[in-house]
Structure formats: C-alpha cells, structure tokens
C-alpha cells in the first residue's frame, strides 16, 4: 500500500519533457537505473488505494542506495532536502529545507537519505518528471500515468494514473483515471518512460541570434508557405497619400454620418466667425491698397531667410534622419575665434574659447577702462590708441562687443584716426586723446579674423614714448577689422557707424589719403559721438575734432568678398558699390588736396611734443595718415583703408564698434628672441604731419596672435619728409601676423616683455617718421644688422594681382633692399587705385598663414615725388640684423624691434620655424656679383599671381656680403617665379615704395629712396620661395628714385 510521504518532500521542480525512452529496471543487485538524473522533488500526497504491497517486488530504498551513496549528489533536490553540500566539482545542489529545520541554520549541509544519495539516478528521474511512464507492478498490471516525483525511499508518485488495457481501446475513461498514485518500491517491477530526450534542454542555444537562425520558429518544424495576398482592385491609384488632402473624410460627410447614426447635429461654421473677424471686401481704392500691402508684407515675410529657416526647421525640410536626430551641428557664425584658420565645423574647448574669443574685448575694455568691450561707443578719449593697446585680444574682441563677424577691415579704418592732442609718451592708461582716436576697432573675434590688428599685437612693441601711435600704427594690424562693427575712431573723427550694410559686410578698406574736405565729416561724427558718449568731455571733443581734421576722410571701406559676408544681413554687393563711390570721392579729394590739410601743423606740434621728433615738412596734416593696411591674410579680404567718404556710413559702425587702442608701452613678446625693445615701432607720421614716431606701431598678433613677432608691421609711412609741395606717399604700418593659427592665444602681447627702446630716443629727431615706422614695423632683422640696414622698397602694384617688385638701389651698393617679407600667402594691400604705401621692414612680415590664397600685399604708395628724398626715421636703432650680412656692422646697440638672435630665424606666423631663411648665398648658386636682369623691371613681366613678398634678411650667416641690392636680389632669387614688373610710370598712380634703411649707426637716419615701381619683397621665412627681382639700376624710373644716403653711424 502506498503511504504518504513526509512533509519535507513536498515540492517538485518541473523538468523539460523527455523525448526518449528511459527504463528504470530493478537490477538483480539492487542497482539504480544506469542513467543518472537531476534530482526531482517528491510530492507526498494521499494516494488512492493502489496495488497491494505484496504484489510485486519494487525498487527499494536499499536497492536504490546500493548504486552508490554519494553525498554530493549533483542534482536538484526536492524541497525536502536542504541545499546539499557539494563534494565534487560540478555538483549542483539546489534545494530548500522545508520540513527539516535543523536548529543549526542554513549553513549546515543537508543530509540525504536513500536514493537521494544516488545522484546519477536522481539526475535521470528528475529529468523525466512530467513524462508519461508505464509502471509495471508485481501482479503484472501496468499503470500509465505522468511521472511526478519520487521519495528518498524510491516511492514513485504518478499523476493521472489509469490501468493500461492489454489492447488499446482508444483511451481511458474518465472514471478510471486516478489523480495521483504512489507506488512503493517493493511493488514496482519496472518503470518505463517513453520518448525521453535527455539532451532536450541542452541541445539548442537559447540566445536570440541562435533562435532567430533556427529554421523552426516557436517549435514549428515546417517552413511557412507564403500565400499571395489578394487585395482586389482597390490597390490602384485610389490611394494617393501625398496628394489627398481630405484627411479621409469630407467634413460634410462626417457631420451627416454623425447626424444619421447618432443624432448629433453639428454647429460647425466654416467661416469660423466666432474666432475671426470677417473682411468685408469692397472695390474701394483704400481697400485694394491695403490688400496689396498685406499681400506684399506676406510675401516679404515668407521670403525672408529667417522665416524660411524657421519653417524649414519646423518641417524638417532637407534634413536627413541623422541630422534630425543624431548629428551634432554647430552654427559656424555663432562663435568665431580669432584664429586664422577657419574653424567652422570644429569644436573649440571652453578654455580655448575663453582665451581666444574675448581675447581682445575683455582685456581691452579692462585695460582701456573707458572702453568696455561691449559698449558701442565707449569713450575712447581716455584710451589713446598709442597709449593702450590692450592685449591683442582687445582688438580681436568684436568691436563694440559686436560679434566678431564684422569684417575686421571695416573695424580697422576707425583706427586710423589718432588723437593728435594726446601728450607724447602718454601712458597707455591715460589717453588724453578723444576716445575715438584712442580706440582701435576690435578685430572681430570670428575665427575668420584672428586679431591681427596691431591691437592684438599691440601688447608688443608700442613704445611709451609715442603714446599715440600714428594713426597708421594705431590702425589695427592688417588683420582686417570687420567694417560691420562701427568703430568710432576718435582721430578719424569717429567714423560714423557704417550703415548696417556696411557694418555687417566685411569690406575691404583701401587706404587712401583723404583730403581735408572730409574733415568736416569727422567733426560731425565727433559731435555725434560726443553726444552719444556720455563720458566724452569737451577736451576730448576738442581732441577728436583735431584728430578728425587730421584724419580727414582717412579711408573708404570697400566691401570685401570676405568670407564673413554671409554674416552680413545686407548684401555685400551694395556695400561694395557704396564703397566704390566713396573711393572715387576720396580719390578726388586726394588728388585735389595732395598737400594735406592745415591740421598737420597741429598734429606736428602735438607730435613734436609727444615724440620730440621733427615733423616732416609735408603740409597736409590730412596727408594720408598711417593706417596699417588690414592684414589681408587674416580675412583674405582686401585691406581696409580709412576713408573720409566712408566715415559717414561708418559713423554707425564706429558707434557700434569699440575701438581698441594700442598700448604704446606694450612690449613685443617674442619667445624666441631676446627681449628687445619693440617699441621702436615706427610711429608713422600722422597723415597731417609726418610724425616721426608719434606712436610706435603696435605689432598685431595675427592668426593665433601667438605670433612670435607680434609687431610685425610693414610700416607704410604716409609722410615722407619731402618738400611741402610734394605729397609724401603714405606709409602705413602693415602689420603682418607672423603667428600661426595654431599659435594664437599663446600670449597676448606681453606689455613688459621688451624694454621699450625707442629708436627715436637714441636717434636724432630728424629721422623721418618713415624710417621709424619702417624700423618699428620691421622688427628685428633676421640677420645681424649691417652698417647699412636697407629696407626693401615695397612698391605696391596698382594691380592687386601683381606682386610688388623689389628694386634694389644700385647706387646704394652696400645695402641690399629687402622688401618686407610677406607670408607665402601674400596679401595685397591695395589702397584703392592709388598705391600709396611704403613697406619697409628689416624683419620679415608674416601674414597669417591661415589665408590659403596667396594675396600679395601691395602697399601702394600714393603719389610720391621722386625728387624729394625723405629721411627715414633715425630714431629707429639699426636692426640688430640688417638684410645684408655683408655689412661689417653686426649688431647695433639699439637692436631693431624685431631683432632676432644671431642665426635664429624668426618663426613665421605660419608656425613653421623660420629657420629656413633664404640666405643670399644659400638660395641660389647665382654669384652675388650677377646683376639681376633688367627684365624684372620691365613692365611686361608680371607675376602670374600675387607673389608673397619675401624680405630676406640674411642672418650673420649670410656667407657673402653683397655690394648692392642687385646681388642680394640675385642671391635670393630662388624660384622661377618672375616678379611682376613695377607698373609703368605712366600708370595712373604708380605705386612708390620707400626704401627704408635703418640708420647705419645708432645715430644718423638712413635716407630712403622711393623707387617708382613696387618691388616684390620675398620673405625668407616664408616657405614658398619668391625671387627677389631687384634691378640695381632703377634707370627705367630714375626720376622717381630717391637716392639712399647711408646714414653715418
């Protein structure tokens, strides 16, 4: 008789159904079934009466245990046993102690009884739990049921048991089925399990990929047969999802349906009278006009880019799924960095953004004090351009806090005006000059325009002695200042903010000497600015007026094709047209008033006070003031000149744009150079009067502003000391950024880095401002200064495409003339049709490498009169290294601002170490003695493309001295590039280049000759070699040549 099992054996784990046959047979030796199995729990239930115990022998507990009693049965025991102790590896014991609560707690290993110690048998028996089994008892009767569990005594519990008939009768009757029977081991002869698959649970992988690859999905062994879908005729063109706007139901049909089926009547009115005011249409003229006006406004609104952008954004027009949901996109114009390299798509880390973006603006405002970076018209008077050129960043900062997007050029023009009144040597902090003069436009922070303006560089060599840099020097470095930002240039009479169009569009401003007539504009602008700027005082106003007069209409802004035009709300084309008109006006003024306005006398007196430098005799104060040509490399847009005519339009711009002023006391920071006073930067004479070195040019750090030689200006000296009758060509400090974009942010000019050695202090005041400006702009020469440092006359060609030609002065044998070095991407400084710039530099000027397109820097000399030789600034100490290494004098006590350590080439802004200077000997095998072919001068030959101007400054390394420029040029002619011949003398405005020779000795200023034709200067530092085309004989334009007289030491 079957007996209930103890309570501890009450739970049973379910096992997968077996599919193979397993037979538990009683062995003669009482062994357990050969197959081991997972232990299955045994359920003790009251069983109906079963076969008598004596009927047949059954597998008894002893027999089962005889198969081997191993404590660590690797099986899942029923709840009856606590978790078993695993004695051998792989043993798995899963169980819970239910009935056996030993007082010792769970850690105690369970004790197994009987067959539970036979792990192999338990493994198989538990594996077949739930399978159909036939139990044959001793009386020969076979019972069929579903195996449920077994006890430790091997008592089998079977569910749904019924007696199995000898012959199949179809199925058991319901009354014959017993829910559960327990067979005692003594009664069981044989237990047969049919169709058991012991590998069922392990033969398949249950990972998603394995299941997906399995042909039988969800247990289906047969593949599905696809059936053709019969959609009928309705799947034709009836369903045009795109063109069908009815939304499925016609509103009237819906209302009708609802009324018929639900009794709901609608109150819908298609006119929406409760929400709108009906228009009563009539034929009156007024109504038609209003209707037309409304239609026009609707068209304007719908055609506006902002509207279209918003609609496209709402509708996701033209955007891919990636752009909609996963792409990270940044607005290119939202955050512009001053780096030369355009970073439009790139992520700029926050620290770098903070360094670069506000570089100029914040610092500027703080240093200038009066001029907050954001205020549109900060009182600039307090800050004089000369005085303070805040860190390079200030310029980089958007003018007026304006976005950097403004074209740098536009900003620069404002800079041109300097306050003449500012006391000389005025500390940068205290600028008595009206704010306009003080503030140099900030270069836009935009990545397009790294602050090139001298302001950026300004920290470098502005000499305290010239608190106010001449307008030219004050002008931001060639890096263009965005015109869009309106800068009030105090000196310029505070250019009125340009019309929004101008302000928005980056425009090339060509530097044109402006006539006095424009002074009125400046005065007007000053008055306007004074009214607008609460901080301006009467004194400042007076300064501004003086500066305005001097400044004249300094420059016109020509809309440039600068990359930033997209930023401009107004089309650049309009700006260009306006600028052209203004240029014409300015040109007329220039031609009409070459002499310059009387303001010059005032400026001269001021300059004398400030600089203690004799003013040039040029009568026109209004004479072209020095405006550093914007550095084309930065924006790639043409340089911007200050033009009176444009001032009117610029007035708003000036208001909008804060001016940044250069700090005259700032010292150039050249990590690779010994600290030299960069302050020598020549202060180009103010246009009104040649200020010998009214203010040191402030080097502009372009590109990264990290250029080692931040103050690299090619200085254009507007005034040459000439007979008053002659209008001196304007020389504009042309700041070329030597810094590589990567370098930017390395330092803003270190104000104290270089002792401010002012050449003017050491040199006689007689030195013309040109020399000073040239020397200051040039910076230390690459090569040790020779007794005669010669400047390469840089004659800007009238044609931007033409590189200026370098004309050596044959008569000045010992001094090769070196054109200022421009970067390989030469930029053209074209000042309108009138070339009027002299670029002289002993040191290479590096335009930002950033500009991919070579833009020759053409500084056009306005009309210079060949007959008058002007003395170059004597102030400037001879550059330590002069272009010609042959000169016996190696280094002068007063090193040029850009003096490099011997043998060390300055690094180009491009970031390439400028070790690869072309030394005359090294460059070409051509013997120095070889004279350059005259063809260079011939007008016919022209540079196919603007060639970079290379000034080769031989280091002391230069193997041989060249007796004359011809030799040097020949030695340096490395490439086959042909220099463009200077424009014909007959050209409407032959550009004249002033050759500035740094004084040979500490004392005498060298006299420079202005060759009629431009000379392309090749900078040795630039990677791309450019031939120097110098003809010793300037015979073709002898009249225009100014002889060089070597200054005595």
Swiss-Prot record:
Modified sites of kind N6-acetyllysine: 205
Record flagged with keyword Nuclease: no
Signal sequence extent: none
Modification note: Thrombopoietin triggers the phosphorylation on tyrosine residues in a way that is dependent on MPL C-terminal domain.
Modified residues annotated as Phosphoserine in this record: 27, 109, 236, 304, 333, 337, 389, 407, 453, 496, 499, 560-562, 597, 637, 677, 683, 687
Entry-linked InterPro entries: ATXN2-like, LsmAD_domain, PAM2_motif, Sm, SM_dom_ATX
PTM sites of type Phosphotyrosine: 116, 262, 307, 347
PTM sites of type Phosphothreonine: 45, 635
Composition bias, Basic and acidic residues: 314-326, 508-519, 578-587
PROSITE patterns cross-referenced by the UniProt entry: SM
Glycyl lysine isopeptide (Lys-Gly) (interchain with G-Cter in SUMO2) crosslink residues: 346
Pfam family, one: PAM2
Oligomeric form and interacting partners: Interacts with MPL/TPOR and EPOR and dissociates after ligand stimulation. Interacts with DDX6, G3BP, and ATXN2. Interacts with PRMT1. Interacts with CIC and ATXN1.
Protein name: Ataxin-2-like protein
Biological source species: Mus musculus (Mouse)
């Amino acid at each position: 008789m079957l007996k209930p099992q103890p309570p501890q054996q009450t739970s049973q784990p379910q096992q997968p159904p077996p599919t193979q046959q397993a037979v538990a047979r009683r062995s003669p030796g009482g062994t357990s079934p050969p197959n081991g199995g997972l232990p299955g729990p045994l359920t003790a239930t009251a069983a109906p009466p079963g076969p008598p115990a004596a009927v047949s022998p059954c597998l008894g507990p002893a027999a089962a245990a005889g198969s081997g009693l191993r404590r660590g049965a690797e099986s899942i025991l029923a709840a009856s046993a606590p978790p078993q102790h695993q004695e051998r590896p792989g043993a798995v014991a899963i169980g819970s102690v239910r009935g056996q609560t030993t007082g010792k707690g769970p850690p105690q290993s369970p004790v197994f009884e009987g067959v539970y110690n036979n792990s192999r048998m338990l493994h198989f028996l538990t594996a077949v739990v739930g399978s159909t089994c036939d139990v044959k008892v001793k009386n020969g009767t076979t019972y069929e049921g579903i195996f449920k569990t077994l006890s430790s005594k091997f008592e089998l519990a079977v569910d749904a048991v019924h007696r199995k008939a000898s012959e199949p009768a179809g199925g058991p009757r319901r009354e014959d089925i017993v829910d559960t029977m327990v067979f005692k081991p003594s009664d069981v002869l044989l237990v047969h399990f049919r169709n058991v698959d012991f590998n069922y649970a392990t033969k398949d992988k249950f990972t998603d990929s394995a299941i997906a690859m399995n042909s039988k999905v969800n247990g289906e062994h047969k593949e599905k047969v696809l059936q053709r879908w019969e959609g009928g005729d309705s799947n034709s063109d009836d369903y045009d999802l795109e063109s069908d706007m009815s939304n499925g139901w016609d509103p009237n049909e819906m209302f009708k349906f609802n009324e018929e089926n639900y009794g709901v009547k609608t109150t819908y009115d298609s006119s929406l009278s409760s929400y709108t005011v009906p228009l009563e249409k009539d034929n009156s003229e007024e109504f038609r006009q209003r209707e037309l006006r409304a239609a026009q406004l609707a068209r304007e609104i719908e055609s506006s880019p902002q509207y279209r952008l918003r609609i496209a954004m709402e509708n996701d027009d033209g955007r891919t799924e990636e752009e909609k949901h996963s792409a990270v996109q940044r607005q290119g114009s939202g955050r512009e960095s001053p780096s030369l390299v355009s970073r439009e798509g790139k992520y700029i880390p926050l620290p770098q953004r903070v360094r670069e973006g506000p570089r100029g603006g914040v610092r500027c405002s703080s240093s200038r004090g009066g001029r907050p970076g954001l205020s549109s018209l900060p009182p600039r008077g307090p800050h004089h351009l000369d005085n303070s050129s805040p860190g390079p960043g200030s310029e980089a900062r958007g003018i007026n806090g304006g976005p950097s997007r403004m074209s740098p050029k536009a900003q620069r023009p404002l800079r041109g005006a300097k306050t003449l009144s500012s006391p000389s040597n005025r500390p940068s902090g205290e600028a008595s000059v009206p704010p306009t003069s003080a503030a140099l436009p900030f270069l836009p922070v935009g990545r397009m325009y790294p602050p090139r303006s001298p302001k950026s560089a300004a920290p470098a060599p502005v000499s305290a002695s010239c608190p106010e840099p001449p307008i030219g020097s004050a002008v931001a470095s060639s890096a263009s200042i965005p015109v869009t930002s309106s800068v009030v240039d105090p000196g310029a009479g505070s250019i009125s903010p340009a019309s929004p169009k101008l302000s928005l569009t980056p425009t090339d401003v060509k530097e044109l000497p402006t006539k006095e007539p424009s002074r009125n504009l400046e005065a007007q602008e000053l008055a306007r600015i004074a009214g607008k700027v609460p901080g301006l005082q009467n004194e400042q106003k007076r300064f501004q007026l003086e500066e305005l007069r001097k400044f004249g209409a300094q420059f016109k802004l020509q809309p440039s094709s600068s990359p930033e035009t997209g930023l401009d709300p107004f089309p650049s084309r309009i700006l260009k047209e306006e600028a052209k008109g203004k240029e014409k006006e300015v040109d007329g003024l220039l031609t009409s008033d070459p002499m310059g306005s009387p303001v010059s006398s005032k400026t001269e007196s001021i300059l004398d006070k400030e600089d203690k430098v004799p003013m040039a005799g040029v009568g026109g104060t209004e004479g072209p003031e020095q405006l550093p040509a914007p550095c084309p490399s930065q924006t790639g847009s043409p340089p911007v000149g200050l033009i009176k005519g444009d001032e009117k339009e610029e007035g708003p711009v000036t208001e909008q744009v804060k001016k940044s002023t250069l700090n005259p006391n700032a010292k150039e920071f050249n990590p690779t150079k010994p600290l030299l006073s960069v302050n020598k930067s020549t202060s180009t004479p103010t246009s009104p009067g040649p200020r010998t070195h009214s203010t040191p040019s402030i080097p502009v750090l372009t590109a990264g502003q990290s250029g080692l030689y931040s103050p690299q200006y090619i200085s254009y000296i507007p005034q040459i000391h000439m007979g008053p009758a002659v209008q001196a060509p304007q020389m504009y400090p042309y700041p070329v950024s030597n810094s590589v974009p990567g370098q930017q942010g390395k330092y803003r000019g270190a104000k104290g880095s270089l002792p401010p050695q002012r050449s003017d202090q050491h040199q006689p005041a007689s030195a013309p401002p040109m020399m000073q400006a040239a020397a200051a702009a040039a910076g230390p020469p690459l090569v040790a200064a020779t007794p005669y440092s010669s400047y390469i006359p840089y004659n800007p060609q009238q044609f931007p495409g033409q590189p200026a030609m370098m004309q050596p002065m044959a008569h000045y044998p010992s001094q090769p003339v070196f054109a200022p070095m421009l970067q390989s991407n030469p930029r053209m400084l074209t000042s309108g049709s009138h070339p009027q710039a002299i670029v002289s530099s002993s040191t290479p000027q590096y335009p930002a490498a950033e500009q991919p397109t070579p833009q020759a820097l053409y500084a056009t000399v306005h009309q210079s009169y060949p007959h008058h030789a002007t003395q170059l600034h004597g102030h400037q100490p001879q550059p330590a290294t002069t272009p010609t290494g042959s000169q016996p004098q190696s280094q002068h006590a007063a090193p040029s601002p850009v003096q490099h350590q011997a043998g060390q080439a300055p690094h180009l802004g491009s970031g390439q170490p400028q070790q690869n200077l072309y030394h005359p000997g090294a460059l070409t095998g051509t013997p120095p003695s070889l004279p350059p072919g005259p063809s260079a001068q011939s007008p016919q030959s022209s540079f196919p493309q603007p060639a970079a101007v290379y000034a080769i400054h031989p280091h002391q390394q230069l193997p041989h001295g060249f007796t004359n420029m011809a030799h040097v040029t020949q030695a340096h002619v490395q490439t086959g590039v042909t220099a463009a011949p200077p424009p014909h003398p007959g050209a409407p405005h032959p550009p004249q280049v002033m050759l500035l020779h740094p004084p040979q000795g500490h004392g005498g200023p060298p006299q420079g000759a202005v060759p009629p034709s431009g000379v392309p200067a090749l900078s040795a530092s630039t990677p791309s070699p450019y031939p120097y085309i110098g003809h010793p004989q300037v015979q073709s334009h002898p009249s225009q040549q100014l002889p060089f007289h070597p200054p005595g030491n």
